[in-house]
Amino acid sequence: MPKGKGRGRPAGRTKKKKKRVSDANGIAHVKSSFNNTTITMTTSGGDVITWASGGTTGVKGTRKGTAFASSQAAVQAAEKAMEAGIKKVEIWVRGPGSGREAAVRALQSTNLEITGIKDITKVPHNGCRPPKRRRM
């Protein structure tokens, strides 16, 4: 292949077109682990509109798992969802992390109307053996 020739990729970052949704209803998926919290805003059909996490708010390291980082991520995701045209949201919470309550409270403080909160954490009926306990 001759030098200097591109391989079909654009030279710079391309500007992404903002999505507008026709339906004003959406779902806020709050996935909270001990290390991080991810908030994904989707349409009621499941198409992703936007997402935010503890890391996208500018927090690094172990502080990504804190309640503060998850509340910042929830506000960030809610603002982007409102720009896309979402007005009502149902919150689905998953995981054992510390940021789940803070994320729900932060979503309630925004201008989004909360239609319901559902806990969809998966609980094993004695499935796989958990990892051994940490000794400090």
Regions found by a protein language model. Give the residues of each.
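Ribosome-associated RNA-binding proteins
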Residues: 1-136
